[in-house]
């Protein structure tokens, strides 16, 4: 049934739609059979179709159109015959993905008059390969040739098993019918090849479209080029089908030193160099009313000369205009789609490229450009040209007409007769169109678990008296200069001497930086880094509790990489392996050894450090495995004289480390054992270590080991909101870190122990709320629960043990009792809550917090209240008044 009006077009679309639905269920084997049969038929009809195209359009050369038809069938088939376009394209068992191809549906194919049969063959074949249907809107000047090509492909496809209406066309094309087709609700994609107006209409249709831009290919010929090859290539390309290929050369820009030689070569091999009036006459005929004169498109050189009012030999290949102006006022500077060529002289290579840039920008941006040079010995020029040209195809030593369509002069450039020009040319793609552009890809993504890890220092030495023996490794490793980082108390009380005496006896030079204070600041860290830069140690030894170790770690970074910006070190991350800022490689200048003199922080084995910006008072927890010390020395002799308050705060810090690591979303079977063992040791030995001190060296040693074991657990499983809030409390009110954790931990447990939280933290391994169950497991492991206890009872017993332990260790019952003034706290609680939410530790908490929830935990902890889910401060304040009112009423 012929299509000559909108009603007939609608009927055609309905038939094609039905055919495509059926075709969408075909297997790859069925599709490939149809694809092959259609390609064979098109190749077999290459000559009659070429004759028909030239006869109807009055453009081009039969013999060249034969080549284009052959290319559109044979090369397209060869390139894509083995490409999977149906069903499952790929499966990745490692990452759990399946990629599935789906056809787009019905394609509207816009075909130009310059390539009426080859483009129809090409678009039909790639549509068949991808289980799509296609309806052609041919150019009126070549409609019969286009539709005949489509029909030949269709009949071959039907014979091979395809539905009968899979390919359709408009018999009497018009602007009205083209627009109706492009805007039809059942059209799923427009594949447009044609003039700028038609391509713009496609993109303006509101439909997904793949269109191509105009070409205005410039050619640069430099002084290293093979001139004979360059001229031969340009002539072959420019005369191919009388220049109608949109990639064909429109201008040559020749470096001055070889300009005359190139000009002479053109003149002696078929090029006609226009002079005087002839040049002006051709300039006048190229453009008509400011646009390309359709009368010259696809015509031989001698006919164009006749149109201009003079004659040239019939064997003239191209008309060459030697011009100087590179702007729209020069007709030769435009796309001409005919065997006419502009020739420019450039003073040098850079000038030639600059002229080529202007020519591309003037009318062929995004399409094609070409360079003739010594590609083997001029890689810098190839690179320079590639960077300067805003074209999707940058051809080197290649005839542009044949090279641009791919697979002829470079076998990685995809064969195509629809050449995308990217955003420069107003196109959606910047490559040669192929089957991959005509399928929708669905990705089935199975849930996968993140790779986890368990990272430790290379060596951990422990037991009483291990310090001097462990230091032997420093000597045997050949270290010559050691910087000890500590605080003034430890320095004045001879702790540093225990290290320097061993090292000096072995001939190791030592320097001590002892200005670290509690909550180390950036200014102190920078001062230590300056000392390191002048002393140039090959080993840095951190001696002390968390503060000296934190300071030493950051000094280490600044010493090894002075170019490092602290603001980047402190940047938050969601996944430590995917962070935007990558810590630099450490250990190039110096190794890091951590010797702990407190039992709590675990910093000797962790990738964490906390530093305070003294300009703002902001505390920054830093995290990266580059900060993990190379060696940790855990010698309990160094903590025998630790004061009771430090024992209590450090011990409860370690308890919190183990608790948070065990319920973290990153907890694993590797970290779980260490968290539980640390808690077991702390439950058994922390009270005795606190009360008896050095009189019970076993208890002190077990707590010291437990703190490091808990450090290993949270170094790998990370922490949670208890630490997030503790960091901010410590920074704002100068509450010791361990005390801040002790004040918060019970309410954090109450907050986390919820099987239906407001928000669950998103992490693949953490597939459901588990904190409640895991707190109960801790109670079981510590022997707190009785047989038959339910989860809630176990958690209450865990909380009761913690409250008893805190009371025994002299911990205040609230933040207010710890000395923070109410007005000061309330003035800062909103900022504390927001800053805690933004803390690096928050991301691993099992319950993803709302800022308002963190505020409630802080308020409840300040006043010594138990956190209760869903109860706000306002409700809690109103409860006593309500109870009193009720009591009066009943009385």
Residue ranges and their predicted role:
Residues 260, 268, 605-717:
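Carboxylate- and glycine-rich phosphate/diphosphate-binding segment that chelates Mg2+/Mn2+
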Residues 452-539, 815-816:
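ATP/NTP phosphate-donor binding region
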Residues 1-98, 126, 268:
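N-terminal Rossmann-like NAD(P)+-binding subdomain of aldehyde/semialdehyde dehydrogenases
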Residues 24, 310-450:
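Conserved C-terminal structural/oligomerization subdomain of aldehyde/semialdehyde dehydrogenase
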Residues 3, 121, 199-327:
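ALDH superfamily catalytic-core signature
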Residues 78, 84, 149, 523-637:
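Glycine/threonine-rich beta-strand-loop-alpha-helix active-site module
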Residues 88-229:
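Rossmann-like NAD(P) dinucleotide-binding subdomain of oxidoreductase/dehydrogenase enzymes
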Residues 732-735, 739-826, 843, 867-868, ...:
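Gly/Pro-rich interdomain helix-loop hinge
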């Amino acid at each position: 049934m012929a299509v000559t009006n909108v009603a007939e077009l609608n009927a055609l679309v309905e038939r094609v739609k039905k055919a495509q639905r059926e075709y969408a269920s075909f297997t790859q084997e069925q599709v490939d059979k149809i694809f092959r049969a259609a390609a064979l038929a098109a190749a077999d009809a290459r000559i009659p179709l070429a004759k028909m195209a030239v006869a109807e359009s009055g453009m081009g050369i039969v013999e060249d159109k034969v080549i284009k038809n052959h290319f559109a069938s044979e090369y397209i088939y060869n390139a894509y015959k083995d490409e999977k376009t149906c069903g499952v394209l790929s499966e990745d068992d490692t990452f759990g993905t399946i990629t599935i191809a789906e056809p787009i549906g019905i394609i509207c194919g816009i075909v130009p008059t310059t390539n009426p049969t080859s483009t129809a063959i090409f678009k039909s074949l790639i549509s068949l390969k991808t289980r799509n249907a296609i309806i052609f809107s041919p150019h009126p000047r070549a409609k019969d040739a286009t539709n005949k090509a489509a029909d030949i492909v269709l009949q071959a496809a039907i014979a091979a098993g395809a539905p009968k209406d899979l390919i359709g066309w408009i018999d009497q094309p018009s602007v009205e019918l083209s627009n109706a087709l492009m805007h039809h609700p059942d059209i799923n994609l427009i594949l447009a090849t044609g003039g700028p107006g038609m391509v713009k209409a496609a993109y303006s249709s509101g439909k997904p479209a793949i269109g191509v831009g105009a070409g205005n290919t410039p050619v640069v010929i430099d002084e290293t080029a093979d001139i004979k090859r360059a001229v031969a290539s340009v002539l072959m390309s420019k005369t191919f089908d009388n220049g109608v290929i949109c990639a064909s050369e429109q201008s040559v820009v020749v470096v001055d030193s070889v300009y005359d030689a190139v000009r002479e070569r053109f003149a002696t091999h078929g090029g006609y160099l226009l002079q005087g009036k002839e040049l002006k006459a051709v300039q006048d005929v190229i453009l008509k009313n400011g646009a390309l004169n359709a009368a010259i498109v696809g015509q031989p050189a001698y006919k164009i000369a006749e149109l201009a009012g003079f004659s040239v030999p019939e064997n003239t290949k191209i008309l060459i205009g030697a011009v100087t102006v590179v702007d729209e006022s020069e007709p030769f500077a435009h796309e001409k789609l005919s065997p006419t060529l502009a020739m420019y002289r450039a003073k040098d290579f850079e000038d030639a490229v600059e002229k080529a840039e202007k020519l591309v920008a003037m009318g062929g941006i995004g399409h094609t450009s070409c360079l003739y040079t010594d590609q083997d010995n001029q890689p810098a020029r190839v690179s320079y040209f590639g960077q300067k040209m805003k074209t999707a195809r940058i051809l080197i030593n290649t005839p542009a007409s044949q090279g641009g369509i791919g697979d002829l002069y470079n076998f990685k450039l995809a064969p195509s007769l629809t050449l995308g020009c990217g955003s420069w040319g107003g196109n959606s793609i910047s490559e040669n169109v192929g089957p991959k552009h005509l399928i929708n890809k669905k990705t089935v993504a199975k849930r996968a678990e993140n790779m986890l890890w368990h990272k430790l220092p290379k060596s951990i030495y422990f037991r009483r008296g291990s310090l001097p023996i462990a230091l032997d490794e420093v000597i045997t490793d050949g270290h010559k200069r050691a910087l000890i980082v500590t605080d003034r108390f430890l320095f004045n009380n001879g702790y540093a001497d225990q290290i320097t005496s061993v090292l000096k006896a072995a001939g190791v030079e030592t320097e001590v930086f002892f200005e670290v204070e509690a909550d180390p600041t950036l200014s102190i860290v920078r001062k230590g880094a300056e000392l390191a830069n002048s002393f140039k140690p090959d080993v840095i030894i951190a001696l002390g509790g968390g503060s000296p170790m934190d300071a030493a770690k950051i000094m280490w970074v600044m010493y090894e990489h002075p170019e490092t910006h602290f603001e980047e070190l402190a940047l938050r991350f969601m996944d430590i392996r995917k962070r935007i800022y990558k810590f630099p490689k450490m250990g190039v200048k110096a190794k890091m050894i951590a010797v702990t003199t407190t039992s709590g922080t675990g910093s000797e084995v962790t990738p964490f450090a906390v530093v305070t910006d003294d300009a703002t008072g902001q505390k920054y927890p830093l995290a990266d495995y580059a900060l993990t010390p190379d060696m940790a020395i855990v010698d309990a002799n160094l903590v025998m004289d630790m004061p009771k308050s430090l024992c209590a705060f450090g011990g409860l810090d370690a308890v919190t480390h183990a608790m948070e690591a065990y319920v973290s979303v990153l907890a694993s079977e590797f970290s779980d054992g260490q968290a539980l063992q640390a808690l077991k040791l702390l439950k058994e030995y922390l009270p005795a270590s606190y009360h008896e001190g050095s009189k019970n060296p076993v208890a002190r040693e077990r707590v010291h080991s437990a703190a490091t074991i808990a450090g290993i657990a949270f170094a790998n499983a990370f922490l949670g909101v208890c630490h997030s809030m503790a960091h901010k409390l410590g920074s704002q009110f100068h509450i010791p870190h361990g005390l801040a954790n002790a004040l918060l931990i019970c309410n954090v447990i109450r907050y986390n122990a919820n099987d239906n939280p407001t928000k669950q933290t998103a992490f693949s391994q953490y597939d459901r709320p588990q904190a409640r169950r895991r707190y109960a497991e801790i109670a079981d492991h510590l022997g707190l629960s009785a047989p038959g206890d339910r989860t809630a009872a176990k958690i209450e017993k865990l909380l009761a043990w913690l409250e008893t332990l805190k009371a025994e260790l002299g911990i205040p019952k609230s933040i207010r009792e710890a000395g923070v003034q109410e007005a000061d706290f309330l003035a800062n609680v909103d900022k504390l809550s927001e800053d805690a939410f933004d803390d690096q530790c928050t991301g691993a908490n099992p319950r993803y917090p709302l800022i308002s929830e963190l505020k409630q935990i802080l308020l409840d902890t300040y006043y010594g209240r138990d956190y209760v889910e869903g109860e706000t401060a306002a409700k809690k304040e109103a409860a006593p008044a309500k109870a009193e009112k009720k009591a009066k009423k009943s009385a």
